[in-house]
Design a protein with these regions (language model features):
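Bacterial N-terminal signal peptides that target proteins for export
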Residues: 1-7
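Glycine-rich nucleotide phosphate-binding loop and flanking beta-alpha elements
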Residues: 58, 73, 120
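Short strand-turn segments of transmembrane beta-barrel domains in outer membranes
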Residues: 38-41, 64-74
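Sec/Tat signal peptide C-region and signal peptidase I cleavage site
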Residues: 15-21
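Outer-membrane beta-barrel pore proteins
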Residues: 41-45, 50-63, 102-106, 154
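Cleavable N-terminal signal peptides
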Residues: 8-9, 19
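Outer-membrane beta-barrel porins/channels
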Residues: 22-37, 62, 78-88, 94-413
Length: 413
């Protein structure tokens, strides 16, 4: 029984382990920011500042709206080691996480805003009969947040902000499980929800000179507790050995601390840079609890390193009607290679982006951008995962990439 249950728990552990570090995290909360490689902490000059750096809201005037969506098309492949070198790929799907922001300047010193976004919102789907079916078939996560933010201008040079984050989420993960000595595989599924979790954020914007700005943004941990049901379809003789019934899994996302700088090197050219620190080492245990006392609750250690993202961006004002943006970023994966799992394969990533802004009228700005993300090829030779419990390590080579297209509409009153 322990091995059969263990395979299911491994899926829970690695689902939690890689969702935030890997491709499930969505940083694209406005088309303009995406075009600039996400180097927006010291720019934050539209309503999406609610997410990137709330202190930037004091730069705005009147009432500002920003809505948009991003089409994300991720692809992952796995190829085993000799002699099993067949290449398997995830199902090709397009996802549309969206964002909406509204901000208002109440006085010279006070601004506020509220926004909706999807910080996680993708899934991976492998063929139900692929070689890694005992590790992962479907992994799906959707997390939504609503965040009100208040900003205060302390002086002509310095602004600060504070915000609350209300979040809810849905998760579904499936795999197969061997049911020796009976033929075929058991099918295991877990689906759960977290209906109410909270976090907070702070921002700071310092402009010692009209051409130069510094930004700091802090996003707290958010503690999720997924409550759901595990369902197993398999041989009735093994029903007591495979997980079923109510289950909870706790997950805490790490802090994010970002430092940014932006400088107008020319009257029409702005360059920006961000350093984003992700505090993974603060989360050391994943807890999985079963309502059925015949299954032992699990407390699984986390073997993670802190990580970081380096972002560079630029914007050029081509004319009164058009602006061009470009960016690049490097995202360091905190997951050790031996713990990479096909539920969410990932590695160090490079992102290359570009976009255009079109002022359709005095009040309306349309931004369109494109981002290509390429994960470095990752060959695992010492995997802690196994084809089946007690079998050969799940060694092989992962490749992942994604194409993203985003559009945002900004309107000011």
């Amino acid at each position: 029984m322990k091995n059969r249950l263990g395979a299911f728990v491994i899926l829970l552990v690695f689902f939690s382990a890689e969702l935030y570090a890997g491709g499930f995290q969505i940083n694209e909360h406005s088309a303009k920011a995406m075009a600039m490689g996400g180097a927006f902490t010291a720019v934050a000059n539209d309503a999406s500042a609610i997410y990137f750096n709330g202190a930037g809201l004091t730069q705005l005037t009147g009432t500002n709206f920003l809505i948009g969506t991003t089409a994300i098309a991720p692809v992952s492949t796995f190829r085993g080691v000799l002699p099993n070198v067949t290449e398997y790929g995830t199902e090709k799907k397009i996802f549309f996480p969206s964002h909406a922001w509204v901000a208002h300047r109440f006085s010279d010193n006070i601004a506020a805003g509220i926004g909706f976004t999807t910080p996680f919102g993708l899934e991976t789907n492998w063929d139900p009969n692929w070689v890694g079916r005992y590790l992962a078939i479907q992994t799906r996560l959707f997390v939504f947040t609503i965040s009100p933010v208040v900003a205060y201008k302390l002086s002509d040079q310095l602004s600060v902000s504070a915000g609350l984050v209300y979040s809810w989420a849905n998760v579904k993960i499936t795999q197969k499980n061997p049911q020796t000595p009976f033929p075929g595989d058991a099918f295991v599924s877990l689906e759960g929800n977290d209906n109410s979790s909270f976090g907070y954020n702070f921002g700071l914007m310092y402009k010692p000179d009209p051409k130069l700005s510094f930004g700091v943004s802090f996003h707290s941990q958010i503690k999720y507790s997924f409550e759901g049901t595990a369902t197993t379809v398999g041989a009735s003789q093994l029903a007591s050995q495979l997980p079923s019934g109510a289950v909870t899994a706790k997950l805490t996302t790490p802090i994010n601390l970002t430092f940014g700088v932006a400088y107008d090197v020319l009257p029409k050219l702005k360059l920006s840079a961000d350093f984003q620190y992700v505090g993974w080492s603060s989360y050391d245990t994943l807890g999985v609890d079963f309502a059925d006392p015949s299954f032992t609750d699990i407390a699984s250690p986390r073997l993670y390193d802190n990580s970081y993202i380096i972002r560079l961006g630029g914007e050029y004002k081509l004319s009164d009607m058009f602006e061009l943006q470009a960016g690049i970023y490097y995202d360091k994966d905190p997951v050790k290679a031996e713990y990479v799992n096909p539920s969410l394969p990932d590695a160090n990533r490079l992102g290359f982006s570009g976009g255009i802004g079109y002022h359709a009228s005095e009040n309306l700005l349309i931004n369109v951008s494109y981002l290509f993300i390429r994960s470095s090829e990752l060959t695992v030779t010492n995997s802690k995962e196994y084809y089946t419990p007690g079998n050969s390590p799940f060694n092989g080579t992962y490749n992942s990439y994604a194409n993203l297209v985003s559009i945002s509409l900004s309107y000011s009153l």
